[in-house]
């Protein structure tokens, strides 16, 4: 009787371990946002042109330029700059 209980326990344990292996672990993944800045638009256009046709000469490799490539503007420096006076008043 003890051997039967051991076999049942091992089967249940095996099923439980297989279930744990098959269950994906939830992780905090950052979702990629659609970028609408000029840099990202330029990258998308370059990638489109590279992949759309090769009739324009040499195949250029796709660019990997994102909105964080050039960094963020420092708001303090922007506020300290003198205003540009294009039109004399």
Swiss-Prot record:
It is found in: Secreted. PANTHER family: CALCITONIN-RELATED (PTHR10505), ISLET AMYLOID POLYPEPTIDE (PTHR10505:SF4). Amylin/IAPP is a glucoregulatory peptide hormone that plays an important role in the regulation of energy homeostasis. Selectively inhibits insulin-stimulated glucose utilization and glycogen deposition in muscle, while not affecting adipocyte glucose metabolism. IAPP function is mediated by the CALCR-RAMPs (AMYRs) receptor complexes. Amylin can also bind CALCR receptor in the absence of RAMPs, although it is more selective for AMYRs. GO terms for cellular component: extracellular region; extracellular space; neuronal cell body. Residues 1-22 form the signal peptide. One of its GO terms (molecular function) is amyloid-beta binding. Transmembrane segments: none annotated. IAPP is the peptide subunit of amyloid found in pancreatic islets of type 2 diabetic patients and in insulinomas. This is Islet amyloid polypeptide. Gene3D superfamilies: 6.10.250.2190. Belongs to the calcitonin family. InterPro entries: Calcitonin-like (IPR021117), Calcitonin/adrenomedullin (IPR021116), Calcitonin_CS (IPR018360), Calcitonin_peptide-like (IPR001693), IAPP (IPR000443).
């Amino acid at each position: 009787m003890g051997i039967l209980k051991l076999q049942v326990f091992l089967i249940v344990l095996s099923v439980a371990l297989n279930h744990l292996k098959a269950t994906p672990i939830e992780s905090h993944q950052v979702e990629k946002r659609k970028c609408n800045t000029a840099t990202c638009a330029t990258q998308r256009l370059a990638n489109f042109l590279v992949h759309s046709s090769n009739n324009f000469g040499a195949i250029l490799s796709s660019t990997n330029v994102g909105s964080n490539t050039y960094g963020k503007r420092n708001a303090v420096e922007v506020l300290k700059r003198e205003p540009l006076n294009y039109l004399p008043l």
